[in-house]
Swiss-Prot record:
Protein name according to UniProt: Bacteriocin serracin-P 43 kDa subunit
Organism: Serratia plymuthica
The organism's taxonomic lineage, starting at the top: Bacteria, Pseudomonadati, Pseudomonadota, Gammaproteobacteria, Enterobacterales
Oxidoreductase recorded as keyword: no
Role noted for this protein: Major component of a prophage tail sheath.
One GO term of the biological process aspect: defense response to bacterium
Length: 9
């Protein structure tokens, strides 16, 4: 998923 523009699941 996206978290602060970083791909994290």
């Amino acid at each position: 998923d996206y978290h602060h523009g970083v791909r994290v699941l």
